[in-house]
Amino acid sequence: MHIVCKVALVSCMFLLFKDVDASAVLWNQQYDKTVCNQEGEFCSKSGVDCCAGLSCRKYNLMGYGVCAAQTCSEEGTFCSLSDSDCCSGLKCKRRGHGYGECSK
């Protein structure tokens, strides 16, 4: 059920409102725990889809990354020129239009 909810959120919400018995409430509580992406799962650059304590790191060219506990981007990972989050001692060096790579 978790996969169905992540792919088809509208259908998932419809099922919750359609069934109001105890099993629907229990299922809703289980669903709430899977709304955020766990460490190692894909995320968007905004990072709002990562679970608490995680942030979106290691972006690719499309602006997607992986949820991780680290607070900065390591050497060799993509970074935004306008909002660089490279680790200490690294700079975001331009590699294309609007993005770069963390390097020394």
Curated annotation (Swiss-Prot):
<keyword id="KW-0528">Neurotoxin</keyword>
<feature type="repeat" description="Domain 2">
    <location>
        <begin position="72"/>
        <end position="102"/>
    </location>
</feature>
<feature type="disulfide bond">
    <location>
        <begin position="36"/>
        <end position="51"/>
    </location>
</feature>
<feature type="disulfide bond">
    <location>
        <begin position="72"/>
        <end position="87"/>
    </location>
</feature>
<protein>
    <recommendedName>
        <fullName>Phi-xibalbin(3)-Xt3a</fullName>
    </recommendedName>
</protein>
<feature type="repeat" description="Domain 1">
    <location>
        <begin position="36"/>
        <end position="67"/>
    </location>
</feature>
<feature type="region of interest" description="2 X approximate repeats with cysteine pattern C-C-CC-C-C">
    <location>
        <begin position="36"/>
        <end position="102"/>
    </location>
</feature>
<feature type="disulfide bond">
    <location>
        <begin position="43"/>
        <end position="56"/>
    </location>
</feature>
<comment type="similarity">
    <text>Belongs to the xibalbin-13 family. Double-knot toxin subfamily.</text>
</comment>
<keyword id="KW-1219">Ryanodine-sensitive calcium-release channel impairing toxin</keyword>
<feature type="disulfide bond">
    <location>
        <begin position="50"/>
        <end position="67"/>
    </location>
</feature>
<keyword id="KW-1015">Disulfide bond</keyword>
<keyword id="KW-0732">Signal</keyword>
<keyword id="KW-0677">Repeat</keyword>
<keyword id="KW-0872">Ion channel impairing toxin</keyword>
<keyword id="KW-0964">Secreted</keyword>
<feature type="disulfide bond">
    <location>
        <begin position="79"/>
        <end position="92"/>
    </location>
</feature>
<feature type="signal peptide">
    <location>
        <begin position="1"/>
        <end position="22"/>
    </location>
</feature>
<keyword id="KW-0800">Toxin</keyword>
<feature type="disulfide bond">
    <location>
        <begin position="86"/>
        <end position="102"/>
    </location>
</feature>
<comment type="function">
    <text>Probable neurotoxin. Induces potent, selective, and permanent activation of ryanodine receptor 1 (RyR1). Does not significantly modulate RyR2 during toxin exposure, but surprisingly RyR2 activity increases somewhat during washout, suggesting a binding to the receptor. RyR1 assays of recombinantly expressed domains 1 and 2 show that domain 1 causes an increase in channel opening, while domain 2 makes this activity persistent, probably by binding to an adjacent receptor site.</text>
</comment>
<keyword id="KW-0108">Calcium channel impairing toxin</keyword>
